[in-house]
């Protein structure tokens, strides 16, 4: 079955989903409890739950995970969300199939501007749909110690009616620079005659940004991949 999915990343000036100016101040939201805060030499981060998402930050679907952080460029919040399987009336449907979307949105807490947005989706799928972030894969780091945070999100996408790997992706942003790692989940497909399990998938490729970026980025990405590539 052919897998159909698309990926959009929108810069902060492109407000397809945020056409109306928000009156609420994102910075007025409740600050996470101090026990949740992690500090390094260049970064202060705190995982947030759905109740701590600023009221001015509107997201589609169900809250999955979130972080608030401060680096040398300012203070920010990121939220990941999933729609689950549904029908998006804005999509073209030729097969009377279903849709599913995942979102990651980063906002500045200083001026309420959207810094970047990731929207990946499956559309018009007649079989099983998988569009979900990997649990606890959202993270905020400063691996190159330059004072600018790296934001990591990992998710899988599939439209399939058989036992086969799903598409797997890691999207990372440092400021407005996007890095992408793409491949497949690793699944067990059977057993050899002497009892050894047989696996399929698990491979990946780095985009140009990752290849040209610091080795620390690739090392972290590979560890994240190895930890979460199973279905």
Annotate each predicted stretch with a short phrase.
Residues 21-73, 168, 173-231:
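Acidic, small-residue rich beta-repeat scaffolds with periodic aromatic anchors
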Residues 57-64, 125-138:
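Repeat-based blade/solenoid architectures
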Residues 100-108, 167-175:
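Beta-propeller blade signature
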Residues 87-98, 127-130, 158-164:
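Short consensus segments that form the blades of beta-propeller domains
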Residues 75-80, 145-155:
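Acidic/hydrophobic-patterned starts of short beta strands in beta-sheet-rich repeat architectures
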Residues 1-5, 19-20:
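Positively charged n-region of N-terminal signal peptides that target proteins for export
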Residues 15-17:
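C-terminal motif of bacterial Sec signal peptides marking the signal peptidase cleavage site
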Residues 138-146:
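Acidic, divalent-cation-chelating loop motifs in proteins
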